[in-house]
Amino acid sequence: SIYERCELARELINR
């Protein structure tokens, strides 16, 4: 889902 993609992307940006 788009929301899941956003969550994953957010984690990558946060690292």
Swiss-Prot record:
It is an enzyme of class 3 (hydrolase). It is found in: Secreted. It catalyses: Hydrolysis of (1->4)-beta-linkages between N-acetylmuramic acid and N-acetyl-D-glucosamine residues in a peptidoglycan and between N-acetyl-D-glucosamine residues in chitodextrins. It comes from Tityus stigmurus (Brazilian scorpion). GO terms for molecular function: lysozyme activity. Belongs to the glycosyl hydrolase 22 family. Its EC number is 3.2.1.17. Lysozymes have primarily a bacteriolytic function. GO terms for biological process: defense response to bacterium; killing of cells of another organism. This is Lysozyme-like peptide. Keywords: Antibiotic, Antimicrobial, Bacteriolytic enzyme, Glycosidase, Hydrolase, Secreted. The lineage of its organism: Eukaryota, Metazoa, Ecdysozoa, Arthropoda, Chelicerata. Expressed by the venom gland. GO terms for cellular component: extracellular region. It comes from the Eukaryota.
